[in-house]
Amino acid sequence: MSLAGIFLDRDGTLISHVDYLHDPEEVLPLLGIAETLRALREAGYLLFLFTNQSGVGRGFFQMEVVHACNSRMLELMKLSPEIFADVCIATERPDQPQLYRKPSPRFILESIEKFDLSLEKSCVVGDSWSDVEAGLNAGIPSALVETGNPVDDDLRCKAAEHQVSVHTDLTAMFVEKLDLR
């Protein structure tokens, strides 16, 4: 039996968006996210962290800084690293070949195979069109959350055109399914 996986963007989806986040002290988890992640894991979902970090590729900071920010996020949420089945940190700049950088579906497709995930039961959740597009490129459902980048009318139309749902936040997306009220 195939498992369900949820591919989660970091900045603007799990934590407040800070351009080129490079200071762990600036990490601020969004309200209710820790509880939602715990509930998703308890419900049997495998969680995957999928984040573009071109600041590394641009030479703004080192990979250790990204790991420190991820560790701080987990510490503030009182979660262990095992909450995520796998983590993809895409360091390519936008002008470089897109190996893992969203909207590339490579990490998703590799994870689907590695973890025997169901295409129908899995999804991508993020706050930007590149997050959504990675899911669409992999052939899995995608959803936008309004906790990071603004979801304007043009983006809403694009989302509707591609049957992409839009939610106020990650918790709102799963509130009924997980009884998070």
Question: Over which residues does each language-model region extend?
Answer:
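Catalytic P-loop NTPase motifs of RecA-like helicase/translocase cores
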Residues: 14-16, 57, 131
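Asp-based, Mg2+/Mn2+-dependent phosphohydrolase catalytic module
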Residues: 64-85, 93-124, 128-181
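Acidic active-site catalytic centers that drive phospho-/nucleotidyl reactions
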Residues: 9-11, 52, 127, 131
